[in-house]
Amino acid sequence: LPEHTEESLLKQLMQELEEAAAAVSVQIMGGHTEITRVVNQPLVTVCGVGKVKKNGLISTGGAKPGMDIIATKWIGLEGTAIIAHEKEEELCTHFSRHFVEQAQALDRYLSVMPEAATAVKSGVGAMHDVTEGGIFGALWEMSEASGVGLEIDLKKIPIRQETIEICEFFNLNPYQLISSGSMLIGTDHGSQLVDALAKEGIHAAVIGKAVEGNDRVIFNDGEKRFLEPPKADELYRACLLYT
């Protein structure tokens, strides 16, 4: 915590951590808190430990050629919510306050546990949460881990209008923006899984396929480009350019 932090904020953080852990039946085993001048806002790091049955592990590297690639919810959720909170007043000079509040509220979608549970029941080959580096980074990581190529339709990648407009305002690439809340899934039955997720109230879309070889190709209205290795997340650029 930064210097001059009020004790009430620490109590609030502890309560939020307890509530979040209880919601997913996780125990908090310990922790450490300190005041330091090297941060200018609260910083929380978490190390999670879990276990899974050997035959129940679904990894990033399980995609096979021919599998459909699904993206759940929408990309850029976390990055959009963070920017909307941190740059609220600046955004309100260009957008309505209602729009900014809608963007801030996207953080309610950050858990991927609901879609993971549905995917496991449906039977899938690979799962990978989309975090730093955005959807482009996650696609590269899944392809690299699985030893497959990709053919992805950019237009099919689900994205919210709030993310599009905020990224345009700050000249950011939404496809390289931290996207916690979205998950990549490799499955032989893409349409059926999308339908199963929809029944649970979870938006999802088939965005492409895993293919033989190493080429990771993005198609956009007939144009073809090759996916590049993950770059620094656009959120960091936003923080550097607009503080």
Question: How does the language model describe each region?
Answer:
Residues L1-L241:
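Helix-biased detector of long, well-ordered alpha-helical tracts
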